[in-house]
Amino acid sequence: MAHNEVSAAWHPALRSEDGVPSNAPVSDDLTQVSKDSMTESAAELKPSEAVIQENDLHSSSTSPDTDASVNVQSTAVPAVLDSDTPVYAEQVLNQENAQKNTAENSAQEDAPDHGQELSQTISDEPHVIETSEESAPTLGAAFGSDANGSHDTAAPDYMMDEPSPAEHDTTERREDNDAASWFNEQVDSGDRQTTNEFVNDDNQDFWGSPTNGDAGDDFFNQLKTQTKPIYIPPETESRYEEGVPLLDNTVESPVQPSMKEESQIDKIFEDDGDDEGGAFFNEVQGSVPNEGVPSPPITRKSTTQVIGSLDASPDSPVSPASSTAQEFNNILAAAASENQVKEDLSDDDLAAKWQAELSDDQPEKSTEDDLAARWQAALDDDDDLLLEDEIGKGPNNGQESLPQNPNGSVHETTQATLSSPFGTPQSSARPQAQPTSYTPHQPSTSDLLQGIPGIAPQSSAAPMQDYFAPPAQPRPTTKRAESFAERSKEGYKSPYDLPDDLTRPRKPVVTHKPVVAQPGSMPPPPRSSSIPVPPTNAPGVPTPPPAPSTVPAVTTPKNFYEELPLPPPRPRSRPASSGRYTPTANIVTSPPSHSQPPPPPPANPYASLSPPPQDSGSVGSQTQLQQPERLDPYANLLGPGAPGAPAAPSAASRYSPKPPTLQPGTKPPSAPRYSPAPPQSAAPAPPRTRYASQPSSVSSQGAVLPFQPRTSSPLAHHEKVSYQPPEGLAIRSAPESASSYAPNGMQPRPNQQDVSNSITAPVGAAGSAAVTAVPENVSAAIQPTSPPRNPYAPPAYINEFSKRVAPMASPPPAVVPPTGDAQFVPPRRSQTQSPSQQASAPGLSVPSDSLQRPASVHAPASPTKSANPYAPSQISIHNRVPSQPLEFIPPNDGQELDPLERWKGAPIVKFGFGGSITSCFPKHVPRYAAGQAAPKIKSTPGEVKIFSANDWVPITEGIVQHPGPLKNKSKKKDLVAWLSSKIAAFENEGISEAAQLHPESSKRHDEKILLWKIVRALVEHDGVLEGSAEVEKSLRYIIFPHLQNSEPESTSGVNLPAFNALPPLNAPSQSDATDSQSLESIRNSLLVGNREKAVWDAVDNRLWGHAMVIASTLDRSVWKQVVQEFVRREVKSTTGNSESLAALYEIFAGNVDESVDELVPPSARAGFQMVSKVGGQGPSKNALEGLDSWRDTLGLVLSNRSPEDHKALLALGRLLLSYGRTEAAHICFMFSRAAVFGGADDPQTSIVLLGADHQHLPLNVLQDDDAILLTEAYEYAVSVLAGSPTSTLPHLLAFKLIHACSLAEHGRKSEALQYVDAITAALNATTKPSGYHNQHLLFGVDELSARLRQTTSDSGSSWISRPSMEKVSGSMWAKFNSFVAGEDSDAASTGSGKAGDGDIGPFAKFSGTPTVSRSPSVSDFGPYSLPAAQSVPGSGPSRYQPGNQYVPNSSPEQYRGRSSLDSQRSSSFGFPFGQRRGSQEPSTPVESSMYQGGPLYGSPSAAGYQSTPPQASYMPLAPVVEDSAPQPYPVEPAPMQGSPVNISPYQPPANESFGEPLDQSSATVPASSMAGYVPPGAGGGYEPPSVEISAAPALDTTEEPTHQDVLKKKKSFMDDDDDDDLAARAAAIQKAEKARKDREADEAFRKAAEADAKRPPAAKKSWFGGWFGGAKKENDNNNNSGGPIRAKLGEENSFYYDKELKKWVNKKDPNSASVSRGTPPPPKASAPSRSASGSTAPPAASMGLGLDSRPPSSAGAPPSLSSSPAPPSLAAPPPMLGTARSASTSAAMPTPPIGSSLPPPPRPATSLSNASSIDDLLGAPQARKGTSAKGRKKGRYVDVMAK
């Protein structure tokens, strides 16, 4: 007994056997004494004195209590001290025991000296230790914090079976060491006194006596002082052995802090002393120990008694346990990490010591001894299963023994025992279960460590944190984790079988435990989460059985052990866990985590032990209600613990003990039904199983589940009540739930049950306190919640269960309370009944149920719990059999080496053009072979299927189909009908889900409808919104629908209301009246002539009439100020809806910009709320509400127009746009007359698309079809219907292209084609190309047209569409060329274009073009001017660009007309652009050089631009430069000259193709602004060239130098030497021929000049003259603005032939050039330019460059075209480009520029046509001259001499 006595002294279970009466009136006394002692010792007494006094007090109050306290102290001392320290601890404990009980005299005899020494040694610490023990349930439990002998006895029985005394000592020391540090920390922190006091007040029932705490403190202090390192066995062993897990203070009051927990711990021990059977639960509840019930029988405190005891206990057990447990766990972890293990005892020694101690304690209670033996046998056989069986056999005894000892003492002892060695102090049955888990491990310390480590760490952490939590972990953890894991795969059968046997006898015991189990079961989830692997096992409920068994073993030698059998229903779950609870090691791992994150341990404690403790300690009402019946049913359920573990969870869960199919009979669901708390006690593990491991139990309980619903309804209701309250607890234990979702979630509810029911009265506050205290204990992780749980369910069991369920539970840890809800899910239950379903259910049911139906869950709470146990049934997961993988026949061609194994086949889906979807799924053909059971699969390609996207995703079309594209007025009716249908749809559909995301979705929805209505009105009135009474009335009805009825009345007498108001007007007159002094002051000021002073005097006296009259004569600023003051003081202060009127007055006063301030003050826009102290309405309402007055303001302004009101509307629109009111802002912009439509990249743009916010939303908003079509309707109204000759929204073409692409993607190809044709027509019709008409747009149109053309099958609904397709296929560029070039050139260009048509590629059309024609286009590509030499190859290149070919081919024609298009396309292509450059460069060289000369890009940039089309963003700028350059060209001849030089070189290529005329044309082109029309126009430089060429005779010389310059420039501009060479060569050739032709032309002209008559004959003589003559006529006809000036050729050669103008121009006469500019009508001009394909082509090229430059500016645009971004970029780049280009083309080029973009290709086409006869162009240009002359006549060439 020496050692055993010592063990008994420090171990609650052992001490109870030492003779301390388990019945403990002592608990109350101890509580009081501990309180007193705490207060005194902490404040006044020295540690030794405190210990002694407390011991005395305890002994005086009750021998059992005194013994309990002594035992606790002694226990704490040995545990914490090293092998050396145990002596002191034993002495102290013996002293205390002697003082307390004669029954412990032997131990006391040894103890007194040691106790004195210890107290002396730790003079200040004893009391602290006592406090620490109280605060740290683990220590108390481990060291016998419970003074009750009964509890000690229970522990000895259990301990005898499981750990040897040596092991026990080792464990004690470990935990003591940890506890010492923890206690010391507690003491140091100053919690000792408070904790002792609190413990004495609230929790002495659990811990028995503050003296124990003192002893513990002394011991720990000594340990601190000792130099020798403290040996700490692994946390698991130490917790199991020491019983740290048994410390279940948290159960009593989760709220109370660690100090409170200490006092609760003391109370717990007192309760154990009072009654082993019921005392445990009573102690848990912290009820006053039943001093009068010393008998060991099962008699337990009534629920009211338990609740009463809980009143005191709830505070400390939880909180103290939390903080202390955390500290203690930390100490244990630190000690373990430091390997500071001073214990001399080996694992075997520890086991021996435990057994000895247990045996010592057992002597007092033979039942406990028997139970211990039984536990050992059971553990040896099947751990939890046997334990459950034995418990089932002895549940009554255990219960009886519990009653025998004071409830407080016995129960305390049980808890202490559980917490120290067994893991769950919550219920005696559970402690036994833990010992059972423990017992199998007793054989070796390693075994103990496996089970205990999981538990011990928890116990160490939880014990200190919440002694209850660790105990649950050790016992259930080891065995359950192992048993469950092992059995999970094997199946629940063995566990179920054992539980069946065990369950029946255990039913009575289970009754309490089921109650505890439910709360307890919930806690396990957290731990399970900490140990995710166990969860699968945990579901099996194996974990619960150990917990129940552990509790009985520890708590009550007999009765508790019998109750433990009741927990065996949890042992069912535990059978797996304990029997196979190998996870105990895992648990060990988890316990540390739990100890670190107390929440997990608390959850576990709740699961396994919390039910009983809660019943008695935390939730007295629940315990009382649940204990009797639930013990039996759950005992039965737990009896089959291993197999029935699932059932146990269900039963424990609440109403369905039945889930354990093995225990249908044992299931007496009535007990579980009615008292979930008892099921917690008996089946604490099952409830945990239910929550954490419930899935696994579900599999076993599948059959039972059907029954559970019946039982579940009562339990469910109870659980609802208890669980919901625990919502707080569950939340507090959220970490626990996090540890294991399912179990935790369930546990929180059981805890809540216990808390709500048993704690409802006493702990109800504690529950809330627990919630609040939880933060305090949060350090312990969720101990506040878990503490209540631990007491009810063995923490180890809970931990084990949690670990088992961890995988299932951990995922949704946050759902801990919902876990209960998830448990509530009945449907899950049915599913979880089958293992396989359980496997799946856990994951799904737990999270989904908890989340999906928490409300409904409440009703089926218990069923859900049972379902949860089932859900976690990872066993079922094991049951699931994965489908057998197919065995494929690998190929032999090397594909088998593919790491992706694509040879096995995979589905292929491809989305194609026009909304087509191609799919191919592989076919798996089985191949059977002899000797093969299964066939091998041969994968072969499947059928290729083509679907239409509309088949899968049908397009939602309105009743009325959009009539677009809107080309003419005939579409008006259809458009109005479509708009009306859309408006009706918006009104009927309501707000879309996407729109609802906006904070003001309803307002924006109304504003959207208003915007559409206004556009419809605009269409109805042909683009007019004002100036007509009818229009104004229509708009007024739209904006103010409410005025429709009042308007007629107003018409007849609008003033009538005003007259009716006249009577009130008298009041205003009265208010306006003032005293004579005010008037006198104003009069005096006026007499002096100080009108301004008079004004402000009137304002100060509120004489507004006087003030305004006088101010009207002063400066307007004074008038504005007076009105502003009037508005502020009179208008806005009168009514709440005066913002709009105030704004109108401000507008009248001229304060346009400030008018919006009346709607939303600047302070509000800045984010401030200004409050007026004077008494305005400002503070009474939201300042931003003024935005809602925008409609009133707009109506007032429109009805009362003023000179500058449009500015006010613009400001209003900006204000609305800044607040995201896009539709309202756009309405204001439309009426402001200053709305800026443009691309998204233009910062000045107000509207890109109506109804689309391009400033605050992503650009993909610009792809909205509704916005595009609405904007198209607006454009249609203001252009077509209004009679505007041109489109007002050039940027909209890009969006129309996007819409066309969208139509094509949806399979509506015919409509898409119509849009393409419309875009092409718009581009052709545009006289002033816009920067938005960049190459990206052109390329996109050409590409889409080519795609549509290629899909001939669906090209159109009828053959009619095909012709249009052919035209498109002929090429967009061909059309442009034909349109721009004019019919003269059209013939040639079309010919070439048709030839190009023959070729499908874009370059196919270039095929016909000779390099010369190409060169002009190239010249347009100034950058490529170097390739001019390549111009000949250029034609090749144009073809060479076949890469871009299909689209570019058409563009090549355009290139012919304008190489710029080519470049644009290439740019759109990007890389092809570069290629095209190569081909085009030859043709472009001149142009490029010219272009270089052209300021457009700074020629090099232009070249670079083309090379870098991606610079779309820059394009606008470059184009701007280009455009400006064209303008500058005329302005800046030199730059133009540079470009002209380029042109000249360009002309030489033209000469090659056309001969001299080309040169002249090129020269002429510059001369005439028409030439500028194309690149020439763009490069007004042509004028400079014209200047160079000015002397027609000298033209050769001039041109030659020009060519040289050009070549040089080309070289300089074009870095490519090859290009320079080519350009130089081409220029040289061209120059030579030009010189010759110019000379001839000069001679002809001279002759013509000399002949006053027409020189047609002369012209005929020389092809030049004839050609020019025709041109002259043409020019005369075309150039009406200014005819060419006749010049005497005899004089200086002031004339030069302007190729663009196709006439001779007098240098000296600027009008001639200007006239030529004015001469060309856009088309004609283009035609002449085309006729001078070279010259015009260069302009086109230059334009192309401009376009290119723009495309570069919109370089991003090309992609954006393909993608949504394109439109913005397209739109964006153009603005600047458009400006520049328009400028360049503005002179004569306006039309040509468009042509330049498109017509230039025609010019190349002409050149191409000529190109077909390159020889003619070069060698025999005369013939060409004829043609070109004709063209020139038509186009621009005027024979100056002819006139």
Curated annotation (Swiss-Prot):
InterPro entries, per database record: Sec16_CCD (IPR024340), Sec16_N (IPR024468), Sec16_Sec23-bd (IPR024298)
Family: Belongs to the SEC16 family.
Gene3D superfamilies reported for this sequence: 1.25.40.1030
Ranges annotated as biased composition (Basic and acidic residues): 165-177, 362-372, 479-492, 1631-1655
Biased composition (Pro residues): 521-549, 594-614, 657-687, 1765-1776, 1790-1804
Biased composition (Acidic residues): 379-389
GO CC terms in record: endoplasmic reticulum exit site; endoplasmic reticulum membrane; ER to Golgi transport vesicle membrane
Region listing for Disordered, in residue ranges: 1-220, 269-324, 339-769, 807-872, 1385-1691, 1706-1843
GO biological process: autophagy; Golgi organization; intracellular transport; protein localization to endoplasmic reticulum exit site; protein transport; vesicle-mediated transport
Superkingdom, taxonomy of origin: Eukaryota
Biased composition (Polar residues): 29-40, 58-76, 92-108, 183-198, 396-448, 579-589, 615-627, 691-702, 749-759, 863-872, 1408-1418, 1441-1453, 1480-1491
Disulfide bridge positions per record: none
Name under which the protein is recorded: COPII coat assembly protein sec16
Composition skew (Low complexity), residue ranges: 309-323, 644-656, 760-769, 826-842, 1457-1468, 1726-1742, 1751-1764
Keywords linked to the UniProt accession: Autophagy, Endoplasmic reticulum, ER-Golgi transport, Membrane, Protein transport, Transport
Membrane topology per record: Peripheral membrane protein
Functional summary from the UniProt entry: Involved in the initiation of assembly of the COPII coat required for the formation of transport vesicles from the endoplasmic reticulum (ER) and the selection of cargo molecules. Also involved in autophagy.
Segment forming the signal sequence: none
Keyword flag Membrane: yes
Protein localization: Endoplasmic reticulum membrane
Primary localisation category: endoplasmic reticulum
